């Protein structure tokens, strides 16, 4: 059973309510463009540093509405199979590019390294021309013995496939690796820079871990996600050196236009704790 949240509403119900409210809000409202807060990361310009994390829009059906919410980037997924991916690609193709679109991928590991690698190659190949950036979701890695080596090995394997696709296609679609910072020993993140990735999406609400990740990754950008409740949390992550910040639960709790309020406060430097 889903854990209960604010007002006794569990996260699954809360997400469904937010999705319904989003569809209605964008039809009746005519929101002004959010303030311009351009940033540059992964070799691309973003209209602002605020993104929607994967897990809210699994298949891209809400892209147009989410772009009106003010996000500078929207991450679709997590997508695990070609069938799921093809459904999402149909929606992405109809989306007028406003926010950057990322596709969060997770190929199911098998006992056969070659088969696992081929699954990653298939997923990345299908998304190569559709997404602004790709995400290899390795956030399920835990802190068991050898996990640090496993994370690096997985990133190296995925990075090698990504590099091969770039050479074959004659183009570059940036690749980010998503991992849970609390399970990554000190010094491990620095090794990801040699794996051919363009950024790391670090899941953590711990300020010390976030600051350490920024130091270890430099010059690779950190995209921070996890535990963000309000605008002050976003400002704190950016001040700590994160290039981009993603939200999820706060969006479900605060409603469709929370991102616009947050960005307006970020632009003026007014960040009330507990508010937008």
Task: List each language-model region with its residue ranges.
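Short, glycine/acidic-rich beta->alpha junctions
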Residues: 54-58, 229, 276
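Short histidine
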Residues: 254-276
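Expand to "…catalyze enediolate/carbanion chemistry for C-C bond making/breaking, isomerization
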Residues: 103, 200, 269-270
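Glycine/Thr-rich beta-alpha phosphate-binding loop at enzyme active sites
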Residues: 22-35, 138-156, 179-220, 253-262
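Catalytic cores of alpha/beta
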Residues: 59-68, 118-122, 182-195, 212-222, ...
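Glycine-rich phosphate-binding active-site loops on the catalytic face of alpha/beta enzymes
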Residues: 70, 74-82, 137-140, 198-206, ...
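An N-cap/entry alpha-helix motif that binds or orients negatively charged groups
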Residues: 1-41
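Active-site entrance/lid segments in N-terminal catalytic domains of soluble metabolic enzymes
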Residues: 42, 51-63, 67-187
């Amino acid at each position: 059973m889903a854990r209960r949240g604010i007002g006794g509403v569990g996260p699954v119900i809360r997400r469904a309510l937010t999705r319904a409210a989003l569809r209605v809000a964008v039809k009746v409202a005519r929101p002004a463009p959010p303030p311009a807060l351009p940033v540059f990361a992964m070799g691309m310009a973003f209209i602002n540093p605020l993104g929607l994390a994967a897990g809210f829009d699994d298949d891209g059906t809400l892209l147009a509405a989410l772009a009106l919410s003010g996000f500078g980037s929207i991450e679709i997924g997590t997508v695990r199979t070609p069938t799921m991916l093809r459904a999402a690609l149909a929606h992405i193709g109809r989306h007028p590019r406003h926010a950057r679109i990322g596709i969060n991928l997770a190929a199911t590991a098998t006992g056969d390294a070659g088969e696992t690698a081929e699954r990653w190659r298939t997923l990345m190949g299908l998304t190569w021309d559709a997404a602004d950036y790709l995400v290899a979701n390795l956030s399920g890695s835990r802190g068991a013995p050898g996990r640090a080596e496993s994370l690096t090995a997985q990133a190296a394997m995925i990075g090698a496939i990504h590099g091969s696709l770039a050479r074959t296609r004659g183009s570059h679609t940036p690749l980010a690796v998503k991992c849970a910072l609390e399970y990554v020993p000190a010094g491990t993140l620095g090794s990801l820079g040699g794996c051919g990735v363009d950024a790391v999406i670090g899941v953590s609400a711990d300020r010390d871990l976030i600051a350490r990740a920024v130091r270890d990754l430099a010059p690779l950008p950190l995209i921070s996600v996890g535990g963000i409740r309000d605008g002050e949390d976003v400002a704190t992550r950016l001040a700590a050196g994160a290039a981009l910040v993603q939200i999820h639960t706060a969006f479900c709790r605060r409603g469709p236009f929370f991102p616009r309020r947050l960005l307006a406060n970020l632009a003026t430097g007014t960040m009330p704790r507990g508010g937008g």
